[in-house]
Amino acid sequence: MPHISYPVIFNNVESFGQFLLGNTEILSYFFITFDFALSIGKTQINLLLPATFPYLRKGRPKTINFRIMPDFVHLHVHTQYSILDGAAAISPLIKRAKALGMKALAITDHGNMYGVKNFHDVATDAGIKPILGCETYVVRNRFEKDKDEKAGDHLILLAKNLTGYHNLCKIVSYSFTEGFYYKPRIDKKLLEQYHEGLICCSACLGGEVPQAIMRNDMEEAEQVVRWFKSVFGDDYYLELQLHPSGDPRKDADVYENQLLVNKALLELSAKCGVKYICSNDVHFILAEDAVAHDHLICLNTGRDLDAVSYTHL
């Protein structure tokens, strides 16, 4: 029997069951009804080891605590259709999500919905619920061509129903036909007009709320949160991210700021009555793809590899 560290944490009930099936010594002592545990929302199972259990070590507690984590869904995901930024091809991405036992997955490419049809079809065929979205760029006025605002603040929009999908298509279309300046851009008037059926998330460090927090302008951050809540109601979420890289240069630019922003977002959540989610800024599939992704960023920005500071997980 392999060495087991306690408590043992599993991503879902299925992986817990696979663990037990792979350790028949444990199964010979216990019988657990997983369906019942699920029906009552049970996420923690305690197993009491009898004194005769052959692998009970001296000094080890006799109760093994198994904690089953709730299902996690990636809601901030960039595919290869985030041009010169995303390095996750759709089919391998869905295959990886399936292997990890994920039941749903979002697509939120930068400023476009080019990959939505392919993503929807591949995910559906794999039995994964596709969540269709976009990471938009928000400026004060989409009609103004101001170089100081050509980038815009990042904002995640997710369609929660057919109405939301239609409104998302309209918003993204207008970002090209009316707001394009270096990038497809939208403004808050479009959000007010076409918010129905959409879930809105505050996005990464490039979002309007995190940017205000990093400027130490909590008053502005609160005003922005309250505006989005007034438009989207309970469908507005603050987005927490944490991406330690192990590289001191990158961590100083990203991870340390994320720690600062997350603390402030949690305070704003409590103060403004806004819910929050946890996400990863997914741009590639496997950890070993990070180097290739850094090269892609260099092609996009024209910077040297040593100057790349932002890495995605």
Where are the regions that the model predicts?
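Ser/Thr/Pro/Gly-rich low-complexity, intrinsically disordered segments
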Residues: 11, 16, 35, 53-54
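Cationic, low-complexity basic patches in intrinsically disordered or flexible, solvent-exposed regions
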Residues: 19
